[in-house]
């Protein structure tokens, strides 16, 4: 776990996203629990489903402590990842996982503040395009501050242990 301190933790620029139920999502909504974010997309053939499965395993390993955290998939492909698509996709892993999407510029503004870069694809004519994105898991603390990240490849046991110490 790469933890951060001080001014690195600020999410300086506000952003406005849409959750998987079609409601507005603002940075303050991260408050109250630890938040694990993965920036990916539902059409991703490999790293995204693997990572979401790993997060499901981590949540299971944390058992009763898992109610102190939330898991989010932040879409880097809003052209295809509409709120209802995110909800259906996430239900394959855990029905408590939450999806965020929105305007590409808002997603990009957020992703760059939390070291989860991606290369936006806009209005692609190719139906099966992919999006190059970070494999890191972003950690947002209960004060809605960027707290650090887990770099890929992910070890479910190490992540579970690190999160267990954060959640206690």
Predicted regions and their residues:
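Structural microenvironment flanking redox-active thiols in thiol-disulfide oxidoreductases
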Residues: 50-110
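Short, ordered coil/turn segments that flank beta-strands lining enzyme active or ligand-binding pockets
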Residues: 20-21, 142
